[in-house]
UniProtKB/Swiss-Prot annotation:
Gene encoding the protein: GASA1
Sorted UniProt keywords: Disulfide bond, Gibberellin signaling pathway, Secreted, Signal
Protein name in UniProt: Gibberellin-regulated protein 1
Gene Ontology terms: cellular component: extracellular region; mitochondrion; plant-type cell wall
UniProt KW Secreted keyword: yes
PANTHER family per record: EXTENSIN, PROLINE-RICH PROTEIN, GIBBERELLIN-REGULATED PROTEIN 1-RELATED
Signal peptide: 1-23
Amino acid sequence: MAISKALIASLLISLLVLQLVQADVENSQKKNGYAKKIDCGSACVARCRLSRRPRLCHRACGTCCYRCNCVPPGTYGNYDKCQCYASLTTHGGRRKCP
């Protein structure tokens, strides 16, 4: 009888732990890439429309967009709307994203 109670208790604890791990995996998948992807091409066209060097701007913006899945609104600034976009830097420490 004591063995069966211990077995049932350990089985219930195992199921609880399994449920918690599964919920954590689902949450991390939602945060890390299964979110709705934005159209980087059109977002970067809007971002770079006033740039003096449009090809360079589109290339840098596209790279940043694919990594971060966001582009700040407007043609300049607004980095607070997309923290990942603002945090990417070149080897020299300058902002990578336009």
